[in-house]
Curated annotation (Swiss-Prot):
The gene is rpmE2. Coiled coil: none annotated. Signal peptide: none annotated. SUPFAM superfamilies: L28p-like. This is Large ribosomal subunit protein bL31B. One of its GO terms (biological process) is translation. One of its GO terms (cellular component) is ribonucleoprotein complex. Belongs to the bacterial ribosomal protein bL31 family. Type B subfamily. It comes from Ligilactobacillus salivarius (strain UCC118). Pfam families: Ribosomal_L31. Keywords: Ribonucleoprotein, Ribosomal protein. Disulfide bonds: none annotated. One of its GO terms (molecular function) is structural constituent of ribosome.
């Protein structure tokens, strides 16, 4: 790799603000706030609003919208049956 053109990649702790879930990962983000991790080391803490622990798609609490309503209206209008 060329020297001096790549961002600093280091380990940080991401914390889901909604659930308090924390995980250690690599990132180029940095923060003034730090936290001591389970291994005893101190890492920068990045707070996120949504993670895999709170996102409805990953938790199984997903709500479906009326996207299929348009198909049902089309089928009803033209007399198609499922």
């Amino acid at each position: 790799m060329k020297q001096g053109i790549h961002p600093d990649y280091h380990e940080v702790v991401f914390m889901d603000s909604a659930t308090g879930y924390k995980f250690l990962s690599g990132s180029t983000k940095n923060s003034e706030e730090t936290i001591e991790w389970e291994d005893g080391n101190t890492y920068p803490l990045i707070r996120v609003e949504i993670s895999s622990d709170s996102h409805p798609f990953y938790t199984g609490r997903q709500k479906f919208t009326q996207a299929d309503g348009r198909v049902d209206r089309f089928n009803k209008k033209y007399g198609f049956t499922n």
